[in-house]
Structures are given as C-alpha cells and as structure tokens.
A protein has these predicted regions:
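N-terminal export/membrane-targeting signals
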Residues: 1-22
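Short, low-complexity N-terminal intrinsically disordered segments enriched in polar/charged residues
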Residues: 21-63
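A short acidic/glycine-rich loop-to-helix N-cap element
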Residues: 29, 126-132
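A solvent-exposed, acidic/Ser-Thr-rich amphipathic alpha-helical stretch
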Residues: 36, 54-109, 132
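A short, structured loop/turn motif at beta-sheet edges
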Residues: 106-113, 141-147
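A short hydrophobic beta-strand element
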Residues: 111-121
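Beta-strand elements of well-folded, non-transmembrane domains
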Residues: 121-125, 141
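Short beta-strand edge/turn micro-motifs at domain boundaries
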Residues: 134-159
C-alpha cells in the first residue's frame, strides 16, 4: 500500500510541475489579437450584406490592393473597386437575407484565418421576383491592429 501512495504522489507531483512548464499566452498579445473569426462573425458580415448597403460591411474589409471575387464580374482588385461594383448590382434588389449555414470550416494560424461555408440567399429583386439559392463562400481574414479584416473573398454560385 505505501508503494502505491508514493507512486501516486510522484505522478501528481510530475503533473503539477509540468503545468508550470507549459508556455503561457501573453495577456497583452491575446487582448490585442481579439477573438479569431467564427461562424457568428461570418454571420455578422452577411447580416451587413442583408441591408444591401455597402456602408454596413465596409468595416470588415481591408483597404488597399486585395482581390475579391463575387458572382459577377470576374474580380475586383480592392475594396474600393468592390464597393463601387457591388453598389450598382445591389440597386437591382429590394431586400436580401443571407444565412451562413452550419458547414462552416475555419482555420487559424497566427494573424491569419481562412474559412469556407455555404450561404443561403433569399432575396427580392426590384421587379418583385424572388431569388433563392445557396452560394459558396471562401474568405481569408488578417488581423490588422487587433481587428480581423477580410483580405480575400470568393463568393460563387454552383453551376446547374
């Protein structure tokens, strides 16, 4: 019996000491990075798009030379270009609702996160026609000054 107690004591001591050896995240670094993007953050972005007003999503996009692919045209080379092009397209809609589905996959590595999901679209065109579909969504976020911004995005509709 005493050998068991001694063995148990040594095991508990080893476990306790090993917890001190584990690297700790700096509280300052963790706070400056904010929370990594998750499904809720992605939905917040799409809720902004549901307003059909680019001013409500601008805060999520990095400025400067970044590539964004949307349903049309082929590509945009910056947020400024994207905003101008999408604003013209959004004028054709009365309302929109975009829901990020449960198939979200997110991967985090330092100041970068990338993810994929499908997004349910339910929109009403200016002529009253209802448009419904499921879109593919790929996004790359970069942590810039503590804020996770989109530096690359791809939205597409599967071919029928």
């Amino acid at each position: 019996m005493p050998k068991r107690i001694l063995t148990l004591f040594i095991c508990l001591l080893a476990l306790s000491l090993s917890s001190f050896a584990a690297p700790k995240k700096s509280a300052k670094k963790a706070a400056s990075n904010g929370s990594a993007p998750d499904k809720a953050y992605m939905q917040k972005i799409w809720d902004g798009w549901s307003t059909l007003n680019t001013a409500n999503v601008e805060q999520y996009y990095a400025t400067g030379p970044h590539t964004f692919f949307d349903i049309a045209p082929l590509k945009y080379n910056s947020w400024e270009e994207y905003e101008k092009g999408v604003t013209a397209i959004l004028k054709n809609y009365k309302s929109g609702k975009f829901t990020v589905n449960d198939d979200v996959e997110l991967h985090h590595h330092g100041d970068l996160s990338w993810g994929t999901a499908t997004v349910k679209e339910d929109a009403i065109l200016s002529d009253g026609k209802r448009e419904m579909g499921t879109w593919r969504y790929t996004v790359v976020f970069e942590n810039q000054a503590g804020k996770w911004l989109i530096v690359h995005e791809h939205v597409s509709v599967p071919a029928h």
